[in-house]
Amino acid sequence: GVQKTVVEAPSTVSAEKMYGFLLDMDTVFPKVLPQLIGKSVEILEGDGSVGTVKLVHLGEATEYTTMKQRVDVIDKAGLAYTYTTIGGDILVEVLESVVNEFVVVPTDGGCIVKNTTIYNTKGDAVLPEDKVKEATEKSALAFKAVEAYLLAN
């Protein structure tokens, strides 16, 4: 099955700077949220471009240890970036993959980050709504922490 969430987050960070973060999140996240994305990011295949597969070692504040991601879209002109979580213990029993699509839309005085998350479950399994809500809330907290970091740097 498929479950989907769409979140739009306004920011006073410029669209260019916010998109730059998306492209560089592997180095920024451990600085901003070491307790979540703490240890390291290993490139397993590729050079950072579309098709790259990486293994993210998660921090102590999460119950999971690893997340395997594949880069699917890098559209610098359209300020779009998509990656899919394809492995690691973060994919709980019912999940096959999780697609994260980001589009940064410039606004007067900042941007809006549109984040669509698509949960692909095994067969007709359903991810419990509280898990979806928890993931959405964690993403919002991470976004606020990143925004504060980008505004300060």
Curated annotation (Swiss-Prot):
GO terms for cellular component: cytoplasm; nucleus. One of its GO terms (molecular function) is protein phosphatase inhibitor activity. The keyword Transferase does not apply. GO terms for biological process: abscisic acid-activated signaling pathway; defense response. SUPFAM superfamilies: Bet v1-like. Keywords: Allergen. Belongs to the BetVI family. May form dimers. This is Allergen Pet c 1.
